[in-house]
Amino acid sequence: MDQFEVLVAVERLFFAWEQISDKETLVERLEGRLADMNLSLSTSPHRSLFLPYLGTRKDHNVADPDTISSEYGLQLLVLENALAHNYSKAISLLESSTVGDVGYIEWCRCMMRLNILGKSYGNNSELDIGLRSYLRNGAQGSSLLLTDEVSDCRMLGFASLFLQEEYFIAVHHMVRSIHEHPSLVDYLLREEDGRDIFILKEEYKLMLTIAVLVAIPLENYQDFLLLEDLNPLLQGLPELHVCLNLLVSTSFGSFFARWLGPIQELANRSCFLAPVWHSVNSHMRSKILVFYIKISERVTVSYLARTLDIPYDTVMADVSSLIQKFDINIGIEGDLVYYKEDLPVGNLVSKVSQIQREIDSKLLVMKQKNDALRSFIENMLKEQSVEPLNRSQDMDAFELHEQSEDEEYEEEHLEEGENV
């Protein structure tokens, strides 16, 4: 099953429809690809948009499984239902299939893609657990660990966490995946090969850039930059590297020029990232505003707008939202944001801390676990230097860090602040 990318091609066409000038050419091209697979755009829920540009091909009928071979019939039925957005039916068909027909890794990849298309992102955590167990127990030391299919599965797992807005867990997933599959960095940074593209490499890299910036606390950016084993990845993500350095140097205006410039532009062009951009952008602005609220007793909205290079009205709305949402004892008089005088200093500190906790619980989790993350990465370096004969001992140490076997990873409870 290597034709799932055509499904996302339909969704990309629908997403970018208003910005497309040569609609007829693109629709005809996509219709031709689908026809070669015995599929038709007429079965898509977006057909009302495409109808004026569809050719004169015969209407497509759903394939009868009794008249076609079992392997081809299964693939056709899965694709047919997914194209029609009957994702639960497509997933059910694939789940009931014989894994041996396509191989376990490819089966996982197909399932993960269907879950992403159907926005059932949480299901991919279980698939990632099963894949990791399979690779560790059944494919240890084999060339399977180096295949692009495995790398794609690990990236699909990362994307699923990102699209759930689980940014810290997504970063954790990437760090662990790089440790388990060092070839993943090469896969991510390598140019597209033009075959079977589901999520673009540029989209993966943008997701990772955003996840790191949002999840890691301001005071820990410098530590992240100094993690030597992540240098190849950081060097391959120049936008992330530049943004981290700007934030470390508190050049917030320059950072937001990039954040609201090329990063926002790329995100809004992606059918995967655009739906979460508003939330991501709000997280990032609030994160910087909380920084100023924590260190300042009195600050003006105009100063914040000027320093962050964000429109005055946007900053005023953000500050007002913070005050209203978290019921903190801070007042606004005209342009001035200040702590109310009747608030004891101890309570003031507590209230400011509450802002940071509640704006994004994952930020707090990251603060609590930053030392564990650093220790985790240091352990990777130690494990990689141990002889292969000691690998079983290394794996035990690695799993001790995770505090569980693979089947417990789904419930790491990171959102509840438990230790890694």
Swiss-Prot record:
Chief localisation class: cytoplasm
InterPro entries (alphabetical): PCI_dom, Rpn7/CSN1
Bias type Acidic residues, positions: 404-420
Keywords: Cytoplasm, Nucleus, Signalosome
Function of the protein: Component of the COP9 signalosome (CSN) complex that acts as an regulator of the ubiquitin (Ubl) conjugation pathway by mediating the deneddylation of the cullin subunit of SCF-type E3 ubiquitin-protein ligase complexes The CSN complex is involved in the regulation of the mating pheromone response. PCI8 may also be involved in transcriptional and translational control.
Quaternary structure, from the entry: Component of a COP9 signalosome-like (CSN) complex.
Identification of the protein by name: COP9 signalosome complex subunit 11
Species: Eremothecium gossypii (strain ATCC 10895 / CBS 109.51 / FGSC 9923 / NRRL Y-1056)
